[in-house]
Amino acid sequence: MIPDCTTIATDPKRFGFHVEPRRLALSILALACLSQAQAAPFAYVPNERSGTVSVIDTASDRVVATIKTGGKPRGIAASPDGRRLYVSDQPTGSLAVVDLAAREVSERIAVGKSPEGVGISRDGAWIAVAVEENNSVSLIRAAAPRELTSVRVSGQNPEHAVFSPDGKWLYVSAEDGAVVDVIDVAKRSAVKSITVGERPRGIGFLPDGSRAYVAAENSDRVYVIDCERAEVIAVIAAGKRSNGIAVRPDGKVVFVSNGGEASVSAIDVASGKITATVPVGQRPWNMALTPDGKKLYVANGRSNSVSVIDAEAMTPLRDIPVGEAPWGVVVR
């Protein structure tokens, strides 16, 4: 176990430093502090036109690395242990697996024509990839990634595939349709279609799994689904071309990006009303929150940037330049 930085620096003999103790203590202090800094969450941003993933240190809000994936990276998910990224690559019809220790692609898994959204179950056991031109979802067991199950959905051009918090259900939105398909993960089959607004895109669950929120881009609405009944129970007017969804970890606020208005709106879960709207870059798309729920990172597809929002005060903090046409964000 590494002692805290202050203890090492002030009492080196306690830890057996007898040869040049001050210099040795300072060296260990620097290494310990560096290790602590590297442990801060990172935001990973796939850039469609650059063929890269930008790595943002959420402590400093600076890009600290760029991972070359090639092709057209879009959907992205991170393993719970922080060792791997899963990134869909549209031109090659594959899922790129990124080794985060080496920050390079370690393998590619064929999933189908034009993959987009990528989801991962909370326990990391399952990965899901929405495959647009196949009108299907590829379900992949993380322990045996070459064993893939393709599940057909009713919605045309599926975009996002998001697991419920308990991992039992997978909700799939479709760009060319007005439905969300529900897949039973254990059965590997679609069991229901829920009618929502036109061009449903982002999906987010409350932490307890009781509700799902779906942004419908062409309807400028967010649809609230009761997950036990698998039916819409409320519709919330959002901004123009609403598309991305992110849920604060405390379950009190749902964020929706408004692609046609360069803004992000905050929905109070208790009242079902928008309580704040924050300006961001052009064509805000998919988003992610830090684990503590304090900061929201928003990919701005036409500004080539990521906007950072104070997710408690609902105020803009800064914009971070990234690659061309950022698609979304995952924080791990």
Stretches with model-predicted labels:
Residues 4-25:
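Bacterial N-terminal signal peptides that target proteins for export
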Residues 28-29, 33-332:
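Predominantly soluble domains enriched in secretory-pathway, periplasmic, or organellar proteins
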